[in-house]
C-alpha cells in the first residue's frame, strides 16, 4: 500500500509541475508565413479537400460490415463444443440472415451500382 501511495504522489507531483511549467512558458505566436500551407508550386488558396464519392463510402462501409461479420463468425466451429450449441448456431444464423437481407435491400435499391 505504501508503494502505491508513493507512486501516486510522484505522478501527481510530476503532473502538477509539468502543468505549472507549461503555464509559465511563453506562448509562441507564429507569423502568417509559418501558418500558410506549403504546397510546392500549387496554389494554396484553393480547396484542400477533394470531392469524395458517396458510393465508394457505402461500399467501404459494407466491406467493413462483412469483414466484421467474418471476424465474429470465425469462432463458430468451436461452438459445437458448448453445452447448448443450438443456441449459438441459431444466433449465428440469425445474424447471417439479417446481413443477407440488408445486402439484398442495398442491391435492389441500387446502392451497389458503381456507375450511374
From Swiss-Prot:
It is found in: Mitochondrion membrane. GO terms for molecular function: NADH dehydrogenase (ubiquinone) activity. Belongs to the complex I subunit 3 family. It comes from Carassius auratus (Goldfish). The keyword Transmembrane helix applies. The chain crosses the membrane at residues 3-23, 56-76, 87-107. Its EC number is 7.1.1.2. One of its GO terms (cellular component) is mitochondrial membrane. Keywords: Electron transport, Membrane, Mitochondrion, NAD, Respiratory chain, Translocase, Transmembrane, Transmembrane helix, Transport, Ubiquinone. It is a multi-pass membrane protein. This is NADH-ubiquinone oxidoreductase chain 3. The lineage of its organism: Eukaryota, Metazoa, Chordata, Craniata, Vertebrata. The gene is MT-ND3. InterPro entries: NADH_UbQ/plastoQ_OxRdtase_su3 (IPR000440), NDAH_ubi_oxred_su3_sf (IPR038430). Core subunit of the mitochondrial membrane respiratory chain NADH dehydrogenase (Complex I) that is believed to belong to the minimal assembly required for catalysis. Complex I functions in the transfer of electrons from NADH to the respiratory chain. The immediate electron acceptor for the enzyme is believed to be ubiquinone. It catalyses: a ubiquinone + NADH + 5 H(+)(in) = a ubiquinol + NAD(+) + 4 H(+)(out).
Amino acid at each position: 500500500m505504501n508503494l502505491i501511495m508513493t507512486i501516486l504522489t510522484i505522478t501527481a507531483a510530476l503532473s502538477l509541475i509539468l502543468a505549472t511549467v507549461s503555464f509559465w512558458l511563453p506562448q509562441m505566436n507564429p507569423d502568417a508565413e509559418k501558418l500558410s500551407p506549403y504546397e510546392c508550386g500549387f496554389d494554396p488558396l484553393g480547396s484542400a479537400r477533394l470531392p469524395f464519392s458517396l458510393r465508394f463510402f457505402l461500399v467501404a462501409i459494407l466491406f467493413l460490415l462483412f469483414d466484421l461479420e467474418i471476424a465474429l463468425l470465425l469462432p463458430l466451429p468451436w461452438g459445437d463444443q458448448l453445452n447448448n450449441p443450438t443456441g449459438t448456431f441459431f444466433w449465428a444464423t440469425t445474424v447471417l440472415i439479417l446481413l443477407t437481407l440488408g445486402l439484398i435491400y442495398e442491391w435492389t435499391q441500387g446502392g451497389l451500382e458503381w456507375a450511374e
